[in-house]
Amino acid sequence: MQINTDLSQKLAIHSGELPWLASPLKGVDRKMLERDGDEVARATSIVRYAPKSSFSRHQHDLGEEFLVLEGVFQDEHGQYPAGTYVKNPSGSSHTPFTDTGCTLFVKLRYLDPQDTERVVIDTQSSGWFAGMVPGLTVLPLSSFGTKNTA
């Protein structure tokens, strides 16, 4: 499956107009923003977990980044309320679930295999910086080599 795979092109997506698509596991739905591959793919998605839902244990061969938009996301490493950014490095694995339900912005398979740092940031209590244009604020989240997430 290929959706918005030309990363050299600028793109604006109104995610509210995209349909929720069921994932392979009950209670977990996705809005696909970008995808290059089938079920295991480089992907950018909005993922919604129903209350008391879970995803089976899996490994992220080229890493995972997510930002919790609503609710509380959980795995065996911790609980992540709305506003939490997490970078799970290449080769990491987890068994995600939620008691209350949650919505995430997720990027998969973008990280350098040599980037081994796990990052967890509470964006709601972090110090944001003035951006390059008036009214823009920026929060650096992760950096490795030439890749930066803010």
PLM region descriptions:
Residues S45-I46, F55-H60, H77-G78, P96-T98:
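Short histidine-centered beta-strand/loop micro-motifs
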Residues L69-V72, Y85, L141:
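A structural feature that tracks compact, well-ordered secondary-structure segments
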Residues Q74-H94:
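Short acidic-glycine-tyrosine-enriched beta hairpin
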Residues M1-E39, G101, F105-T149:
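A short, N-terminal "cap"/entry segment at the start of jelly-roll beta-barrel domains
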Residues D38, S56-E64, T95, K147:
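Short, low-complexity cationic-aromatic patches
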Residues A50-S53, Q59-D75:
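Glycine- and acidic-residue-biased ligand/ion/polar-headgroup-sensing regions
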Residues T44-V47, A150:
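Short, well-ordered beta-strand segments enriched in hydrophobic/aromatic residues
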